[in-house]
Amino acid sequence: MRDKIRLVSSAGTGHFYTTDKNKKTMPEKMEIKKFDPTIRKHVIYKEAKIK
């Protein structure tokens, strides 16, 4: 089952991406380096729940 998640910027800008992941194959929290257009740099995005 694929669940929708939110990837929140660790830079504190409030920018986020939405995506989905398979919880069976990836049970741990997701961390990925992506581009933050607010500060125009690549930063680590961490998984958070969609409210």
From Swiss-Prot:
A Pfam family the protein falls into: Ribosomal_L33
Domain of life: Bacteria
Keyword Mitochondrion belongs to the record: no
GO cellular component: cytosolic large ribosomal subunit
Keywords from the UniProt entry: Ribonucleoprotein, Ribosomal protein
Example of a GO MF term: structural constituent of ribosome
One GO BP: translation
InterPro entries, per the entry: Ribosomal_bL33, Ribosomal_bL33_CS, Ribosomal_bL33_sf, Ribosomal_zn-bd
Family statement drawn from the similarity comment of this UniProt entry: Belongs to the bacterial ribosomal protein bL33 family.
The protein's name in its UniProt record: Large ribosomal subunit protein bL33
Organism: Colwellia psychrerythraea (strain 34H / ATCC BAA-681) (Vibrio psychroerythus)
